[in-house]
Amino acid sequence: MAALPISDDYPARRAPVVTYLLIAANVVVYLITPVAALLTRYGVDTTRECAQVVFLFEWAAIPRELLSGHAIPLHELHDSIIPGPCLGQLTQFHKTVWLSPLYAMFLHGSWLHILGNMLYLYVFGTRVEDRMGHVRYLAAYLAFGYISAYGFALTDPDGVTPLVGASGAIAGVLGAYLLINPRGRVLGTIFYVIPIRMPAWVLLGSWFVLQWLSLEADSQGDSTAYAAHVYGFIAGMIVGLVLRRSRNAYGGGALFAWR
């Protein structure tokens, strides 16, 4: 089912400050990177494309690097990895590999990529942040991003394609929401056009099934990191389960005092 969320029926008790800040940070980072190519210093055509490629290899999470703990040496990069015209623009740089999943969470490949991610984060992050509190929500979000990145690396240990996007972290938010508020009503669109209100478990459950089936199909040429989505979602479900049990244990009151 091709569905996009628009809003849910949950009245938040506090302003989702962290969710808003995450959205703002993602948008700002996208606008100032070569991927958006809005700054004239990135040039046009081949120069711009090379700036994008070089930028991603310097900052994005790369499976092979994550598992080895070291950046790929320049002499191992060739035309099959980086387009020939761009190789000359690469210089040896110091890359802190363990931080690359953090950087990658704020990088996106296109306008559609970031808009879709931010829409899901806005709709579902508000509820999860309200339940967890600001600090723990941020910690969980970052943890989801790391888990999804390293999970993706385990499925493609020799991969050299840069992994970018907040999708893995947001998948964790979706998984947590599914356990926190499965019967919540979400306003969405079917096939991106037809508005419909449905239970959260229907929309999120179908989303996860779609990611799983796409992962199993392992479509050639598909640039979507389905494994990252699956790992992130499962991590989020575990957190959501803990939240539900904590709420039951303490009578449904305020879950955490952290803000």
Question: Predicted regions: what is each one?
Answer:
Residues M1-R259:
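A detector for small-residue-rich transmembrane helices and their helix-helix packing motifs
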